[in-house]
From Swiss-Prot:
This is Selenocysteine lyase. GO terms for biological process: amino acid metabolic process; selenocysteine catabolic process. Its cofactor is pyridoxal 5'-phosphate. Keywords: Acetylation, Cytoplasm, Lyase, Phosphoprotein, Pyridoxal phosphate, Transferase. It catalyses: L-selenocysteine + AH2 = hydrogenselenide + L-alanine + A + H(+). Pfam families: Aminotran_5. The modification N-acetylmethionine is found at residue 1. It is found in: Cytoplasm, Cytosol. Its EC number is 4.4.1.16. The lineage of its organism: Eukaryota, Metazoa, Chordata, Craniata, Vertebrata. The modification Phosphoserine is found at residue 129. Induction: Up-regulated in acute glomerulonephritis. Regulated by JUN/AP-1.
Length: 445
């Protein structure tokens, strides 16, 4: 039986993929972790910050004595670190349990705000009085994370909202700006487009979308229509490339700690919270987080999230350069060992930016489905796609099919995502491991 130690940057050479356990003939067999888009290990500095908070800041942050004040100070400092990481203001950050809650909170708030406005108009009358049975309209892409897609589908089923799922272009791999603008209706209230796709690494044109929506909003306001808000789920992009809310021009941005070597909590950025951008709580209780997200704060986790954000602010350019170098080397080695005709790089679109760490590829062959190949690997720890879709068997990823990847090719897909301390030597081990796995499967046939 084999066991793998969680990767960490200060472990022996290289920390990110240090194995343990027993392999054939009871000898240790090295494991290489390449599933950093699924989750990342905690940085040692993050663990230290969390541990210190557990020892020293155990008090209730709402309490006036020293342990409580210490907890409150840690929370405020973490809020500032998150704001600095994304170029926002601390008062525009709300802590949540993670990305799923943040995304649901945005959708919930837009629905509540729509109906609050409808009620207000009904009381005041006027030219733009509400239409009976009117529903808010959402625009999103066909490749969003389930924490966006499923809540929206649920609202449609409940006849609470209308949703347009804009297909991604098979030429660029992106949700095209013109297609998004073409979907706008008078009742449109939110455009939500992920910043980078978790399976392919494709970066979406969020700044251009925001610019076009902002221009459109001027026309809408002049016509007496409410403005359209823009949300992006930045879970996969943070820690891999620079993310700045001013450059993006968004009203909401989702932050997920465990994607950038932090703990499994999250946060939500809301531009001009309560003043320019509405937010409605899903929970009601003690009034924490200015009543927007009540519940006694999880100080140690928030401390860790703040430290992880601080490390990203300090080192993001170096992280990005290293991951890009290793990812590019991985793709070179795959094509060199298997041949360019046999390797299909599923997320390379001319002129389209990708995350620096993500390689989604297929090895062509009739019996080389992704999950079958991974089962034969002795070294590689990776996935065929999103971790939340790991129970789909040999069915190809709907995301890859949306990108125009042929069915048989998509069924063979593997998603390898490298981390901050993944090395070229580990890439060599992984490529050789894939070669032996493929050879074994072909021999069995």
């Amino acid at each position: 039986m084999e066991a793998a130690v969680a990767p960490g940057r200060d472990a022996p050479a290289p920390a990110a993929s240090q194995p343990s356990g027993c392999g054939k003939h009871n000898s240790p067999e090295r494991k290489v972790y390449m599933d950093y888009n699924a989750t990342t290990p905690l940085e040692p500095e993050v663990i230290q910050a969390m541990t210190k908070a557990m020892w020293e800041a155990w008090g209730n942050p709402s309490s006036p004595y020293s342990a409580g004040r210490k907890a409150k100070d840690i929370i405020n400092a973490a809020r500032e670190s998150l704001a600095k990481m994304i170029g926002g203001k601390p008062q525009d950050i709300i802590f949540t349990s993670g990305g799923t809650e943040s995304n649901n909170l945005v959708i919930h708030s837009v629905v509540k705000h729509f109906h609050a406005n409808q009620t207000s108009k009904g009381h005041t009358g006027g030219h733009h009085s509400p239409v009976k049975g009117a529903k808010p309209h959402f625009i999103t892409s066909s490749v969003e994370h389930d924490s966006i897609r499923l809540p929206l589908e649920h609202l449609v089923e409940e006849q609470v909202a209308a949703v347009t799922f804009v297909p991604v272009s098979k030429v660029s791999g992106q949700a095209e700006v013109d297609d998004i603008l073409a979907a706008v209706r008078p009742t449109t209230r939110l455009v939500t487009i992920m910043l980078a796709n978790n399976e392919t690494g494709i970066v979406m044109p969020v700044p251009e979308i925001s610019q076009r929506i902002k221009a459109l909003n001027q026309e809408r306001v002049a016509a007496g229509l409410p403005p359209i808000l823009v949300h992006t789920d930045a879970a996969q992009a943070l820690g891999k490339q620079r993310v700045d809310v001013e450059d993006l021009g968004v009203d909401f941005l989702t932050i997920v700690g465990h994607k950038f070597y932090g703990p499994r909590i999250g946060a939500l950025y809301i531009r001009g919270l309560g003043e320019f951008t509405p937010l409605y709580p899903m929970l009601f209780g003690g009034g924490q987080e200015r009543n927007f997200r009540p519940g006694t704060e999880n100080t140690p986790m928030i401390a860790g999230l703040g430290k992880a954000a601080e490390l990203v602010t300090q080192n993001c350019e170096a992280y990005e350069a290293h991951m890009r170098d290793v990812r590019d080397y991985l793709e070179e080695r795959l094509e060199a060992e298997f041949g360019q005709k046999r390797i299909h790089l599923n997320s390379q679109f001319p002129g389209t930016q990708r995350l620096p760490n993500t390689c989604n590829f297929s090895i062509r062959g009739p019996r080389l489905q992704g999950h079958v190949v991974l089962a034969q690997c002795r070294v590689l720890m990776a996935s065929v796609g999103a971790a939340c879709h790991s129970d789909h068997g040999d069915q190809p990823s709907p995301v890859l099919l949306s990108y125009g990847v042929p069915f048989d090719v998509a069924r063979n897909a593997l998603r390898l995502s490298v981390g901050r301390s993944t090395t070229r030597a580990e890439v060599d081990l992984v490529v050789q491991d894939l070669k032996q796995a493929v050879a074994q499967l072909e021999d069995q046939a």
